[in-house]
Amino acid sequence: PTRRSSDLLSYAARLFSTALEQSVQSEEDRKILQQLDRSLHGAESMLSALLDIARLEGGTIQPNRQPYPLHDLLSDLELQFKSIAAQRGIQFKVHDVQFWIDTDPQWIRRIIQNFVSNALRYTAKGRVIVGVLRSAERPQHIRIGVWDTGPGIAEEQRIKLFQEFERCGHTSPWGEQGLGLGLAIVQRMTSMLDYPVHVYSNLGQGSCFMIEVPIVPAPKVVAQPVQAVPLKTKAYKILCLDND
């Protein structure tokens, strides 16, 4: 019910904003309306994130774990983020692999998307890299990581990163402002999936966010037996002409 109520409120606010847009005349009014629209979008995002946190904490949503090809996630990430990285002059590289992992496809996508979004938000120049490492301590696990050349995160700030409304302490060079809720959602998802999270960072030297996930064998493709289809034949009369 809470989710439906919030959706109705958001829809009503959007209708109000659209009605205003059709009636404004001056450029100043249009700027005010644009600010209102951005505020509405921010409020919707915050409410949605808070509801997600409440649902995760309340156990009303659970991960749907299954074998999942990591290649699908990595290729989608490259398509999703390469354009914005190019616009900002940031090198964006995704190192593809062919592992299958035990995960919830939607959850793992949201987790890594959050890491990449944060990296692009705070990196002014340089590169953002998505890659995979084998875990030295756990041979049947891999680490999916996002490296950036951003401003880095101080140790005292890293401790609080996964709390609600906490940010890295830096201002985005691109004018973006996060809600401070994305990593809080990541923390709850990784906890329910039993994925360790690792953060490596030093001020002025960039950051790396990693999660450790179990690998599984690729599902075997079972060939379907081919059924013989009887040929339908007709009787034909053969006429032979002798021209001798």
Where are these regions (language model features)?
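Short, small-residue-biased leader/transition segments that mark boundaries at the very start
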Residues: 1-5
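Short alpha-helical segment of the dimerization/phosphotransfer core of two-component systems
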Residues: 38-46
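Disordered, acidic interdomain junction associated with two-component signaling
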Residues: 45, 156, 210-242
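Helix-loop junction within the histidine kinase core
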Residues: 54-65
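A conserved beta-strand-to-alpha-helix junction within the catalytic ATP-binding
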Residues: 64-79, 239
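Short conserved segment of the HATPase_c
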Residues: 153-167
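Glycine-rich ATP-binding loops of the HATPase_c
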Residues: 194-200
